[in-house]
Amino acid sequence: MVLPIIIGLGVTMVALSVKSGLNAWTVYKTLSPLTIAKLNNIRIENPTAGYRDALKFKSSLIDEELKNRLNQYQGGFAPRMTEPEALLILDISAREINHLDEKLLKKKHRKAMVRNHPDRGGSPYMAAKINEAKEVLERSVLLRKR
């Protein structure tokens, strides 16, 4: 009686693993090696001329604004967090800056923490940076007080 339940759970786990693996592979295969290196903050001293264009995203799965923001970002964190860096960490777009209030900031902070919380496999360092980004924007003149 317990055996069919165990088998069912095993099959379900395998199916979900395969599905997430295929989704990850779909995104991964659209990125060039230099783009992957750039996203992982790996510096390549002298990329060959044929690969210079590979630093730009070729994926249609990522919207244009995010492509531009990631292509301009040099990687790493500044010693003291700046407002542009905080906006990038919390994924606040240029359109949302005009409407940035406490409610939107809380929503973006929560979304980032859900994705990167240490209890769910995220990095404690990134969680600290997300909290720091929220604090920077709370003190910022960009935040509209109601």
From Swiss-Prot:
Keywords: Chaperone, Membrane, Mitochondrion, Mitochondrion inner membrane, Protein transport, Stress response, Translocation, Transport
UniProt-listed SUPFAM superfamilies: Chaperone J-domain
Domain J: 85-146
Subcellular locations according to the entry: Mitochondrion inner membrane
Stored InterPro entries: DnaJ_domain, J_dom_sf
Family annotation (PROSITE patterns): DNAJ_2 (PS50076)
UniProt main location, coarse: mitochondrion
Keyword Transport: yes
Purpose: Plays a role in mitochondrial biogenesis and protein folding. Participates in the translocation of transit peptide-containing proteins from the inner membrane into the mitochondrial matrix in an ATP-dependent manner, probably by stimulating activity of mtHSP70 (SSC1).
PANTHER family: MITOCHONDRIAL DNAJ HOMOLOG 2, PTHR12763
Other notes: Present with 573 molecules/cell in log phase SD medium.
Protein name as it appears in the record: Mitochondrial DnaJ homolog 2
Name of the encoding gene: MDJ2
